[in-house]
Amino acid sequence: MGVLRHVVCAMSGGVDSSVSALLLKRMGYHVTGVFMKNWDSQEEKGLCSSDRDCEDAYKVCKMLDIPFHEVSYVKEYWHEVFSNLLWEYERGRTPNPDIICNKHIKFKHFYQYAVNTLGADAMATGHYARTSQEDEEVFQQKLTEAPKSLFRDRFEIRKPVRLYQGADLLKDQTFFLSQISQDALRHTLFPLAGLTKGYVKKIAAEAGFQHVLKKKESMGICFIGKRDFENFILEYLEPRPGNFVSIEDGQIMGKHKGWFTLTLGQRARIGGRADAWFVVDKDVTTADVFVCPSTFHPALFRDTLQTDRFHWIAEEPPAELVHTQMMDCHFCFNNRMPLTPCTVTLNLDGSVWVMVKEPMRGMATGQFAVLYKGHECLGSGKIIRLGPTKFALQKDQSNTNCLHKDTNQQHPEPHS
């Protein structure tokens, strides 16, 4: 009789993690369900439903007759995710807490808890994603430390595990997994890898998981709940009012409560104005937020960005990029957007420049640039610098044309 493999499944109280636990048990594994509490909602007037989610996860584990545990990462989440979120917003950036949470909480602290405390052979989550490993290969992996240099040891014989989009491309969640470590990925199972959301719901219905099936799919950030983002963020950051300024003529259009309540591309709520204006830039030194009068204004579009040191899931850049310093692939900075063709340039410090084929709307610093080659998610880097907008380039071209015109007028062609 073979060894009974122990898999710890992260339980959120939702349909995806519930079906993941069910499938793992059907595969013959010894499954333990664990609910993570990452946010203390005692002072949030019940807006974050973590208590109900925990109860729902417990009910599923009871129905499956598997052990259930609850673990708190409230302190870790505050210091490693939420504090970082506030720091980024104060500097005018637009962070992604879901990517940061997966990196630091689910695939670091929870992963270590599963392996070291519960003695798991592997962990599992309900993400719609897959890897290059067969399930049995996951159990053969050894724990190793992440490389401390830009490239891993060339003399280390270690085939990297690769992250791929799941079968349901509409629900693919590799975007949110683009910062996780190679070591955690090696020890993770994704039971929903080959399934569609519709089929997962069918499995849940047949299993009698009605209490999770009827729940609305979580969208957005849990700790904000149903509140307006501006009201939420102002509970943690002091209001810093400033002006809405037209990008076209410098006219003051109205007042705002703080640049950190706004992100590039969103509609600016300017009192007394019925027409739509959109955020195109922020100056944290003057508190000015620059706006434009159309959702398709050229000031919202740009085609170039730079990241910080890029996190390659396979621990090193693709050979093509190392050899030529340039590579064609696909890019996105928002999980709801389609993948866009781009060219990537590798810098000596490990950062990358990304140039997309067509200018894109609403890119902002603090967001993550996620790269794909085919269906493989290569990794991501935080956007630290943006190239010029179409509007800025048009102005430069206009000024250059005016300069040439003035020069020609000052030095007219001699008459023949």
UniProtKB/Swiss-Prot annotation:
Q: A Gene Ontology molecular-function term? A: tRNA-5-taurinomethyluridine 2-sulfurtransferase
The membrane spanning regions, by residue number, are none
> Which cysteines bridge via disulfide bonds?
C101-C222
Locations listed in the record: Mitochondrion
For the region Interaction with tRNA, give the residue spans.
171-173, 334-335
Q: Does the keyword Repeat apply?
A: no
The UniProt regions of compositional bias labelled Basic and acidic residues, in chain numbering, are 403-416
Q: What EC number(s) is this enzyme filed under?
A: 2.8.1.14
Q: Name one Pfam family in it.
A: tRNA_Me_trans
Positions that bind ATP = A10, M11, S12, G13, G14, V15, D16, S17, M36, G126
Q: Where is this site: Interaction with tRNA?
A: H127, R267, Q367
Residues of the region (Interaction with target base in tRNA) are 96-98
Q: What is this protein called?
A: Mitochondrial tRNA-specific 2-thiouridylase 1
Task: Give the span(s) annotated as Disordered.
Answer: 397-416
Q: Does the keyword Cytoplasm apply?
A: no
Top-level division of the source organism's lineage: Eukaryota
Which major enzyme category is it? transferase
What is the annotated role of this protein in its UniProt record? Catalyzes the 2-thiolation of uridine at the wobble position (U34) of mitochondrial tRNA(Lys), tRNA(Glu) and tRNA(Gln). Required for the formation of 5-taurinomethyl-2-thiouridine (tm5s2U) of mitochondrial tRNA(Lys), tRNA(Glu), and tRNA(Gln) at the wobble position. ATP is required to activate the C2 atom of the wobble base.
Q: Cellular component per GO? A: mitochondrion
Write down the HAMAP family for this protein, in alphabetical order.
tRNA_thiouridyl_MnmA (MF_00144)
Gene Ontology biological process terms in this record: mitochondrial tRNA thio-modification; tRNA wobble position uridine thiolation
Q: Where is the active site?
A: C101 (nucleophile), C222 (cysteine persulfide intermediate)
Keywords from the named record? ATP-binding, Disulfide bond, Mitochondrion, Nucleotide-binding, RNA-binding, Transferase, tRNA processing, tRNA-binding
Q: Which organism is it from?
A: Danio rerio
Q: Which reaction does it catalyse?
A: 5-taurinomethyluridine(34) in tRNA + S-sulfanyl-L-cysteinyl-[protein] + AH2 + ATP = 5-taurinomethyl-2-thiouridine(34) in tRNA + L-cysteinyl-[protein] + A + AMP + diphosphate + H(+)
The family this protein is said to belong to: Belongs to the MnmA/TRMU family.
Q: Which PANTHER family match?
A: MITOCHONDRIAL TRNA-SPECIFIC 2-THIOURIDYLASE 1 (PTHR11933:SF5), TRNA 5-METHYLAMINOMETHYL-2-THIOURIDYLATE -METHYLTRANSFERASE (PTHR11933)
